[in-house]
C-alpha cells in the first residue's frame, strides 16, 4: 500500500479531555486532503466486573453523543497520562458500581474509533468483588444492573448494547472464559 503523509496539523479546539485537529494529508496520487482528528489526551480504562455468581455488573447512563441511555461496562479517563490504567479501572469500578476488587486482570485493549480518534482503552476483568460505596462525580448519574453473560451476548446481537468497549469486553470474556 502506498504511503499517506501528514503535511500539517491545525488545532481547532482544545477541551478538558480531547483536542480536535484538522490534518492536512498528502495522498499517494499527489492530491491533498483534510481529515479531522480527535486526540484523547489522557487515555482511558474500563472494567468488566464479574460477581461470584458469574453475573456481570453493567451501568446505564445517558450519553449525549448518541442522545440515548447506554448500557456499558464501568469506564473513565485516567486522571493523568502517568496514571496506570489498572488504577483507573479500579477507581472507576468503585466510583460507578459501589464495588471494589483486589483481583483485576488485563483482558484486552481496544482502539475505539480508528478512523478519526486515537483513543485506546485498556479493559480489565475484576473478580472477587467486595461491596463498597458508590462515589459518583457531581454530574454523573447512572444506575447499576446485573446480567448473566449469556443475556449480555444476546443484548449485543439484538442491538441493545451498542457501546464498542462494552461489546469488545463482553465478547472477549465470553470467548476466553466461557467456552
Regions found by a protein language model. Name each.
Residues 2-3, 38-41, 46-48, 52-91:
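Conserved Nudix-box catalytic region and its N-terminal flanking loop in Nudix hydrolases
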Residues 9-12, 109-113:
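Short, solvent-exposed loop/turn elements at beta->coil junctions and helix N-caps
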Amino acid at each position: 500500500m502506498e504511503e499517506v503523509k501528514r503535511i500539517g496539523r491545525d488545532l481547532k479546539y482544545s477541551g478538558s479531555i480531547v483536542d480536535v485537529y484538522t490534518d492536512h494529508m498528502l495522498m499517494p496520487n499527489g492530491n491533498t486532503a483534510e481529515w479531522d482528528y480527535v486526540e484523547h489526551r489522557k487515555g482511558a480504562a474500563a472494567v468488566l466486573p464479574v460477581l461470584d455468581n458469574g453475573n456481570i455488573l453493567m451501568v446505564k447512563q445517558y450519553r449525549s453523543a448518541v442522545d440515548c441511555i447506554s448500557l456499558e461496562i464501568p469506564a473513565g479517563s485516567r486522571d493523568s497520562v502517568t496514571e496506570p490504567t489498572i488504577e483507573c479501572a479500579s477507581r472507576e469500578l468503585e466510583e460507578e458500581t459501589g464495588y471494589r476488587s483486589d483481583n483485576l486482570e488485563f483482558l484486552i485493549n481496544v482502539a475505539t474509533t480508528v478512523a478519526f480518534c486515537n483513543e485506546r482503552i485498556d479493559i480489565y476483568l475484576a473478580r472477587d468483588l467486595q461491596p463498597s460505596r458508590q462515589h459518583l462525580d457531581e454530574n454523573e448519574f447512572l444506575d447499576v444492573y446485573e446480567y448473566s453473560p449469556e443475556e449480555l451476548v444476546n443484548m449485543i446481537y439484538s442491538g441493545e448494547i451498542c457501546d464498542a468497549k462494552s461489546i469488545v469486553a463482553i465478547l472477549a470474556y465470553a470467548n476466553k472464559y466461557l467456552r
